[in-house]
């Protein structure tokens, strides 16, 4: 009988808290160019996030710092701790974390990626890497302070996004893969300044990911991975795991055990015949 298990694990440094603080249509005509905005601590944008693997989630992106990278970058955090943890494991939202002040460039694998090349001008073209995909981007049109952009990849994937100068960030951002599935959709619901409340950004490291699949009646898989301290902040605060599991019928079962170096069980899960689970996100202190 078929038994399959896939799991991704990540050990995480911290949740940084700050207290007190549909399709896209092209547009043409309008201003010659749109300049990069200046953000302040507490500026916020309320988005609805949609992906094929999860239910829609609405959360605020909030400017938590304006002094990252020697005062050259902002830090964007989020009001949902679950979304912050998911991003740490899956790189779910590229606009969480550091963004440059010069171009609002998002960081991927430690490198700033110019998703928007300010000043934004009609027919301007540039390239960047996002979601580990290389994109060729261009400005489709400008109308007042609203700029519609698109980007294409060699595999047929495409991005469509709109920058709204009146709010200082995206009003929409959609990533569609080569098969036509929208892998990520961000739609702006509201925006403002002076956010009050906790926001989070979780820094992840020591990422471990693997997939096990077997159609035989019995299989045992053992694997080992090592977790080191963060290079500047010492021990991690927690481990976050993300898993999918699917068990065949008949007498099939799946048993998952995660042990530490002292053989203490940190996580134990069992699935019986026909059981399945998808997109589970959990934490281990």
Where are these regions (language model features)?
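Bacterial Sec-type N-terminal signal peptides, specifically the leucine/valine-rich hydrophobic h-region
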Residues: 15-18
């Amino acid at each position: 009988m078929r038994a399959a298990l896939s799991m991704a694990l990540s050990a995480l440094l911290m949740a940084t808290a700050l207290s007190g603080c549909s399709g896209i249509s092209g547009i043409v005509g309008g201003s010659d160019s749109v300049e990069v905005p200046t953000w302040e601590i507490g500026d916020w944008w309320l988005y609805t996030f949609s992906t094929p693997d999860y239910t829609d989630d609405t959360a605020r992106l909030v400017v938590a710092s304006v002094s990252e990278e020697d005062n050259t970058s902002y830090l964007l955090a989020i009001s949902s701790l679950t979304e912050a943890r998911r991003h740490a494991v899956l790189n779910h939202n590229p606009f969480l974390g550091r963004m440059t002040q010069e171009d609002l460039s998002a960081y991927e694998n430690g490198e700033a990626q110019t998703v928007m090349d300010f000043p934004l001008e009609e027919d301007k073209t540039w390239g960047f890497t996002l979601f580990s995909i290389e994109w060729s981007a261009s400005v489709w049109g400008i109308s007042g302070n609203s700029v519609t952009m698109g980007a294409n990849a060699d595999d047929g994937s495409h991005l469509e996004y709109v920058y709204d100068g009146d709010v200082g960030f995206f009003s929409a951002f959609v990533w569609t893969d080569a098969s036509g599935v929208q892998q990520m959709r961000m739609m702006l619901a509201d925006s403002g300044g002076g956010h009050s409340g906790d926001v989070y950004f979780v820094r992840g490291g020591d990422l471990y990911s693997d997939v096990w699949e077997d159609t035989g009646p019995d299989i045992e898989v053992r694997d080992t991975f090592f977790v080191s301290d963060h290079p500047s902040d010492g021990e991690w605060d927690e481990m976050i795991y993300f898993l999918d599991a699917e068990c065949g019928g008949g007498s099939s079962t799946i048993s998952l055990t995660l042990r530490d170096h002292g053989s203490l069980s940190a996580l134990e899960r069992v699935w019986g015949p026909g059981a399945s689970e998808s997109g589970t996100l959990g934490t281990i202190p």
